[in-house]
Structures are given as C-alpha cells and as structure tokens.
Amino acid sequence: MQRVALVTGANRGLGLEIVTQLARLGLLVVPTARDADSAAAVAHALTASGLQAVPGVLDVTSDASVGALQTAVLGQLGRVDVLVNNAGIGHDFGRPAAGADLALVEDHLRTNLLGSWRVSNAFVEGMVANRYGRIVFLSSGMGALSEMGGGSPGYRVSKAGVNALVRMLAAETAGANVLVNAACPGWVRTDMGGPNATRTVTEGADTAVWLATLEDGGPTGGFFRDRAAIAF
C-alpha cells in the first residue's frame, strides 16, 4: 500500500526538502502552503520528476483552512498516513523574556504550537482507526527544558509546548501503531536559520524523514536529533 504523507509549510526550506525526500521514497505526498500557487508549483515539480504529489492549501492558524484541507485530502485520497508538522515561525530570536512583546509571543504560540495541534487533530483519529500513523513535529533544542536558556521567548515557549504535545499524543495513541515524535533539525541554512547556519537542508531534514517512515514498533513520544534520542 502506498502511504500518503502531508507536510505543512512545504513550499521552501526544510518543508520542501522533507516532502521531496518522502516523495523519492515512494510516498504520495501532499505539499501544503498558504499560497495555492506555491503549493501547486511544488507538486508540479515533483510530478514532473516522475513522483506523486497532490498540492494542498493550508493556513495552520485557521480552523476553516484546516477543515477545508481535511475534507479535500480525505475526499480525494481517503486518508493521511504520515503528517509532518513543519510550518512555523521564529521572529523573536535574541529578544529577552523579561519585558517581552506578548503579542509576538502569542504569534509564535498560534503558529508553532496551536497550528501543529490543529492539523494533528484533523488527522490523528483517522490514523488510529486505520491502525497506522506517523506524526512528526519539527521542534528545536531551544524548546528543551534540559537546554533552556534566556532569550527568544516566543520561539522557545512554543517549541516547549510542542514537545509536551508530542508526549501527550504519543501516550493517547499508544498501542494503535501511531508513532508520534519530535525532531530537532539543528541550525539549518533556511530563511529562518540564515546563511551562517551550520547545516544544509538535506542534513536538517534527515531525522524528520526517518521518523516519518519508521517501521512498526518504532519509538514514540521521543525527541530526536541526528536520529538519536535527546532530553526534553
């Protein structure tokens, strides 16, 4: 059976690399983006290379957008087997928590935490019913309590929340062959990471792709960097 993989924020950077690698592994992929033309361009490039892709329009902060995507994808493809929650923002790097702009913190929570939660809610029940699912959250060591420092409060707190959500969903889907994990890609040369970052997008995507294609009985409820477990 060909698996269906949906990747959020797949029009550039890590998301584009992840969706491309999954397509090359033989999955039918759904690259999503807020802009319909951007999502369609990714899908067209993949299909032109002989891969299978269906574009999806998605704003993770909108209930209506997520609901419309859910209806469209399930109506056309029947199910989603793999979900990679990649869409995210990082707009307060280096800013202090003391005196933080709380509206900016809320922006990070709305996209990074609630956005990925909203999309997961749309598809996790189907995964449980089908007795197969892989949910991957793109997180960060900056959200690990074990590594927590100062600065970047919206980004850090939102990713700490993502890590907590991973643990909850993994516990709630235990025994259903739904594996829920977080991936830390490291500091990657993307629009967010900047040109001085130490990793390529290929390196940054590797752990997420590995988690998205885990064999049955693989780990769940974990946090991984370079395919090795790290502390929350």
Regions found by a protein language model. Give the residues of each.
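A glycine-rich helix->loop->beta "capping" turn
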Residues: L51-Q52, A72-N85, H91-F93
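Hydrophobic positions on the long internal alpha-helix
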Residues: V84, V119-F123, L165-V166, L211
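Catalytic loop of short-chain dehydrogenase/reductase
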Residues: I89-G90, P96-L109, W117, V128, ...
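C-terminal helical subdomain
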Residues: G175-V178, A182-P185, G194-F232
